[in-house]
Amino acid sequence: MNPDTAEMAIPLLREQPAAEAPPAAARRRDTKSPSARALARLSAPLARVRADPWRIAAVADSWRALWSSRLLVWAAGAGTVLAFGFGPARKAFNPPGVTRGFGAIGNLLAAPAARWDSAWYLVIAHYGYRPDLGRFTIARTAFFPLYPLGIRAISWLGSPPVLAGVLLSLAALALALYGIHRLAALELSSLDAARAAVFVTAFAPMAFFFSAVYSESLYLALSVGLFWSARHGRWALVGVLGALATATRSTGLVLLVPALALYLYGPRLDRPPDRPRAGAAGPPRAMAPRYRLRADALWLALVPAAAAVFGAWLALGGGDGLAPFRSQQIWGRHFAGPYVAVWQGLGAAFEGARQLLSFQHAHVYYPAATGSPTVAASHNLMLFAFLLAAIPALVLAARRLPRAYVLYVLAALALPLSYPVAGQPLMSLPRFLLVLFPLHLAAGSWLAEHPRARRPLLGASAALMVVFLAQFATWHWVA
């Protein structure tokens, strides 16, 4: 098959011949009531799902991964609290009525879901970004508004804010798992790989954040939807989803990179390329876009526009329009150069190992760290281990997925790896990696080819999730 037309083959092969329009007499005999016709239109999407085995598999696999992983999360979180208590008090992050104060059972159920940054989202959902709330106003703007707005909207229906946040996260996770399955099936042409990718996502070591009052699941659902829409050439939807992702997290801005890459270079299913593949014609020809810019590319401007609207809204309210970006300094992040945190993280991990092996009770080998020397050293080793684990997945993604996926991972990692924190250069890296679904797709493709490794690796990943969740539920910092 001609490679220039191969991208159009899948949708063309799946198309069914259009049914002929019924004759006028038959149309006159249609005696369905308006309510029956409306019901038929509403049930059409469900009928399409039932008619497509790929969609049926996506629904079944994503649902199984969702309920089994979340059951493990709540059982492990509640069990940890029952066994060890709620852990050390963190008054600044544990205000009454926000993450606690719901009675014995309510506090127990909130333990796996409402910790640390959850308080920021819940406070924003209630108070917004009012500039009269003291010194924490700028720090609050690091948390973008869409997720707390969702919490507030659900709370209007009568739900407590913590429950509203959990429901929002679970709904977004369900959509994200379904989208990952569909996207993996499209890119890898394998139901086994799609199923494995879904379970890799649901049982990742930090996947308990997906059902916590955190924005990870919402951002994941929006970014997966953006890629699916871009592959199918729905550029208005790409712009809207990109804007919503940017309104969820500042890293949503980097989604403009893969969106542009898919627009200009493909692969795309909406139309054939305007130029043939470069082949062996050399670098200049290889860099030439395969698709010409058209008016629909303007939809991509919605992605950066969302960040501008957020800044303008803060400024109109009497705040600082650049506060969302200046707030990174308050959180200890500073620009040190592109990907400099990789080298700094290696140094912190090495010194952390020396610290642990020295059995010293003071910061002997890494004085930049704060708090317990043992805890700080262990964290730096753990963070660097996550970085090392991401490397083979990134290499595999570069071999098996379109280039736009790899560009997305590299662009998204440029933010945490270029803005390190002094005591922990790779702080929060596991959460940044958690939402980079191309790594999950790559891992799923590998597990599909090595079925004997599937259960041991997924079991080990689930065990790590339980360990990290136990720390999170008892107010120990994880990521």
Which role fits each region the language model picked out?
Residues 179-182, 200-203, 218-237, 256-259, ...:
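Specific aromatic-rich, kink-prone transmembrane helix
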Residues 211-218, 429:
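Short acidic/glycine- and proline-prone juxtamembrane loop motifs at membrane-interface regions
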Residues 72-90, 113, 256-389, 404-409:
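Membrane-lumen/periplasm interface segments of specific transmembrane helices
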Residues 152-153, 167-187, 389-395:
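Transmembrane-helix motifs of polytopic, lipid-linked glycan transferases
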Residues 301-304, 449-477:
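Signature aromatic-anchored transmembrane alpha helix within multi-pass, membrane-resident enzymes
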Residues 137-145, 149, 157-175, 374-384:
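Loop-to-helix entry region of an early transmembrane alpha helix in multi-pass inner-membrane enzymes
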Residues 112-130, 136-159, 342-347:
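Short hydrophobic/aromatic helix or loop-helix immediately within or flanking a transmembrane segment
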Residues 160-164, 180-203, 220-221, 237, ...:
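Transmembrane-helix signature of polytopic, membrane-embedded enzymes
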